[in-house]
Amino acid sequence: MYESENASEHHPELEDVFSENTGDSNPSMGSSDSTRSISGMRARDLITDTDVNLLNIDALESKYFPADSTFTLSVWFENLIPPEIEAILPTTDAQLNYISFTSRLASVLKHKESNDSEKSAYVVPCEHSASVTRRRERFAGVMAKFLDLHEILKDA
């Protein structure tokens, strides 16, 4: 059903694919031949931007991929990191670490508590903060018990 492929590889034009596979140069899906086989085609090359913006996923599937059709779509991955970041962080590892760090930093800045025991006006309370606080307290209690046990065993 799906073939993995790199985004940098050449992808044929929609008209070329239809003319090669069906002999039809019209890429319209409204023709009577609904058993077209598109091998190695990307969905974004097949579906128009207008339809992507206007239709939901079920409508897109029924319009472009009828149940009686046979389609082989390619799976592709595109690098969405800006060129400036690629220049600073050339390896994939460094880029992933940067993305992870900045997302955690954004979360901390969004959900942090201010220094004076009241919440700042711009801080959005996290719905999980109470759960995290309870778990942190339980973990601290368990660690305290382990340290007490360690002291008892060390003195014995």
Curated annotation (Swiss-Prot):
It holds the Pfam family Herpes_UL33. One of its GO terms (biological process) is viral DNA genome packaging. Residues 19-37 have a biased composition (Polar residues). InterPro entries: Herpes_TT2 (IPR005208). Its main location: host cell. It is found in: Host nucleus. Residues 1-37 are annotated as: Disordered. Keywords: Host nucleus, Viral genome packaging, Viral release from host cell. GO terms for cellular component: host cell nucleus. Belongs to the herpesviridae TRM2 protein family. Associates with TRM1 and TRM3 to form the tripartite terminase complex. This is Tripartite terminase subunit 2. The lineage of its organism: Viruses, Duplodnaviria, Heunggongvirae, Peploviricota, Herviviricetes.
